[in-house]
């Protein structure tokens, strides 16, 4: 069985036309109805709301961008590709396909298990969306429509209640695993990218992969 532990880092949309569209959809809260109150809201909060709307696209594959993909096969050392989205995705897909061919010799086969933290709702979906938008062929070795046993999401494994989901940092702490969070975390990726800190992002992404894999191994261990 091949296990692929996956983590992606994303950043907000940088396409001017799309940003204009996103900003055009910003509206005051529905509780504000009076004309003068709406005008006051725009004056006091409008610019911040526009910036927040663009920043939130880093969570949405429709508009956001992938800037780094970290991964590891089975117990192999974690790897990461960081850079322009199209190149990063193609490199990752090539590595996944090559690994499947090397392991199974005759033809690429599906990776049996994808492991990640919030991978079902975020990483895998975001990656699929970006590949579709960019017209990048998706390798058959990744189970895009994964069956339950092909997807091991440590967030869901710990607590399937979405209202009580746990962060990777917190899960690591309660399981006695070194947390990957330090000077850099997901909320700082956009600024790190803007500052050109690609190596730091890649290092952080690989640390996330290592931590996620360690959590998964502990969650699935039969030892007391």
Predicted segments — roles?
Residues 1-129:
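Conserved non-catalytic scaffold segment of RNase H-like nuclease domains
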Residues 2, 64-83, 104-203, 207-224:
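Metal-dependent phosphoesterase core characteristic of DEDDh/y 3'-5' exonuclease domains
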């Amino acid at each position: 069985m091949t296990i692929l532990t996956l983590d992606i880092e994303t950043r907000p949309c940088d396409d001017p036309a799309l940003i204009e569209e996103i900003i055009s959809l910003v509206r005051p809260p529905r509780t504000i109805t009076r004309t003068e109150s709406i005008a006051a809201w725009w004056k006091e909060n409008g610019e911040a709301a526009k910036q927040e709307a663009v920043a939130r696209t880093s969570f949405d594959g429709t508009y956001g961008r992938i800037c780094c993909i970290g991964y590891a096969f089975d117990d192999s050392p974690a790897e990461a590709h960081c850079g322009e989205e199209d190149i990063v995705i193609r490199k990752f897909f090539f590595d996944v396909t090559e690994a499947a061919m090397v392991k199974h010799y005759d033809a690429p086969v599906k990776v049996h298990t994808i492991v990640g933290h919030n991978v079902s709702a975020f990483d895998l979906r975001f990656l699929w969306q970006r590949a579709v938008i960019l017209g990048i062929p998706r390798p058959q070795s990744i189970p895009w429509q994964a069956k339950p046993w092909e997807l091991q999401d440590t967030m869901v494994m710990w607590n399937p209640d979405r209202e009580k989901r746990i962060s990777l940092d917190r899960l690591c702490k309660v399981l006695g695993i070194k947390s990957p969070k330090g000077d850099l975390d997901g909320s700082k990726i956009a600024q790190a990218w803007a500052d050109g800190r690609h190596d730091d992002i890649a290092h952080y992404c690989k640390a996330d992969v290592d931590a996620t894999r360690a959590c998964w191994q502990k969650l699935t261990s039969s030892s007391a």
